[in-house]
Swiss-Prot record:
Catalyzes the reduction of the glycolytic intermediate dihydroxyacetone phosphate (DHAP) to sn-glycerol 3-phosphate (G3P), the key precursor for phospholipid synthesis. The keyword Membrane does not apply. It comes from Shewanella frigidimarina (strain NCIMB 400). This is Glycerol-3-phosphate dehydrogenase [NAD(P)+]. The active site is at K194 (proton acceptor). One of its GO terms (cellular component) is cytosol. Pathway: Membrane lipid metabolism; glycerophospholipid metabolism.
Length: 338
């Protein structure tokens, strides 16, 4: 049994493992939990996650645990890195096992399925008001993060001390710069919307529209993110930071992004099911599109790019037709509110 850790990471996929490696590489005792005991045994024996991060060895400070109770007992700092559609279920499982002094941070990017609620609302529903909450987000492809290549992220939360402690835990002079941010809502929203726009950027490139169209789509996607953020009380300046523009540009322009590759396949004429199967991992943007569209409709926020992507994914519209509709929209002023 692991008696103590500075932080426990829930979720042994590519991103959860990469964050655990980064934390342990800083010299912090880190525990990584996954739901499948057999898979976790393989990780423990090989000291690597060959399925998602081949060739990258675990630091000595990284321990593996398949028992959720033991994993949660090991640390007061709990980092949740699971797909958004199981986020609530994982917290529900965790609730009776949490330490009284537990503090919850997540790197999950998305909103609640069907409702479009922010994950902070899901967390409060499952955990109550007792535990401090935080979120981290930014341009972080798992393979590059695990390999020690430099990047930067933002962290925001409900408790200033917890945010400060997370900055200290995560920051590494050689591999990861961490910015504190007081916009808890904006940091969460950026991670969901960028996945949607990345699918659109991939579709644009898959059709063959070129760099000009991709850049225009990214720019107007940022407008949509800012528009939605303003409607739910986010700070507009957040969206020109790491969790907004930073993550958006990364996800829209590099083929390490599953969302972008998914969009590429759609733009090349493949159907949704085939495109998802080709990726072989969770494409968060597929669900995020429905979630973001649901939230925008509920708030009456105009998001034409998101709406067209939704119609491609859920109503069978051809990507070329979606592009035509976007280009033929009424002429208007280029401002965030128009």
């Amino acid at each position: 049994m692991n008696n103590a850790a500075e932080i426990t990471v829930l979720g042994a996929g590519s991103y959860g493992t990469a964050l655990a490696i980064s934390l342990a590489s800083n010299g912090h005792k880190t525990l990584l939990w996954g739901h499948d005991p057999k898979s976790m045994q393989v990780l423990a024996e090989s000291r690597s996650n060959e399925r998602f991060l081949p060739g990258i060895q675990f630091p000595d400070c990284l321990s593996i645990e398949a028992d959720l109770g033991k994993a949660l007992a090991a640390s007061k700092n709990i980092l949740v890195v699971v797909p958004s559609h199981v986020f609530g279920d994982v917290l529900k499982q965790a609730k009776p096992l949490l330490r009284d002094d537990a503090r919850i941070v997540w790197a999950t990017k998305g909103l609640e399925p069907e409702t479009g609620r922010l994950l902070q609302d899901v967390a409060r529903e499952q955990l109550g008001e007792h535990y401090p909450l935080a979120v981290l987000s930014g341009p972080t492809f798992a393979k590059e993060l695990a390999a020690g290549l430099p990047t930067a992220i933002s962290v925001a939360g409900t408790c200033p001390q917890f945010t400060h402690d997370l900055v200290e835990l995560l920051h590494s002079p050689k591999r990861l710069r961490v910015y504190a941010n007081d916009d808890f809502i904006g940091i969460q929203l950026g991670g969901a919307v960028k996945n949607v726009i990345a699918i659109g950027a991939g579709m644009s490139d898959g059709i063959g529209f070129g760099a000009n169209a991709r850049t225009a789509l990214i720019t107007r996607g940022l407008v949509e993110l800012s528009r939605l953020g303003e409607a739910i009380g986010a700070d507009a300046s957040t969206f020109i930071g790491m969790a907004g523009l930073g993550d958006l540009v990364l996800t829209c322009t590099d083929n390490q992004s599953r969302n972008r590759r998914f969009g590429l396949a759609l733009g090349q004429g493949k159907d949704v099911i085939t495109a998802q199967e080709e990726i072989g991992q969770v494409v968060e943007g597929y669900r995020n599109t429905k979630e973001v569209f649901t939230l925008a409709k509920r708030l009456g926020v105009e998001m034409p790019i998101t709406e067209q992507i939704y119609q491609v994914l859920y109503q069978g519209k051809a990507p070329v037709e979606a592009a035509k509709e976007l280009l033929s929209r009424d002429k208007k002023s280029e401002t965030l509110k128009k």
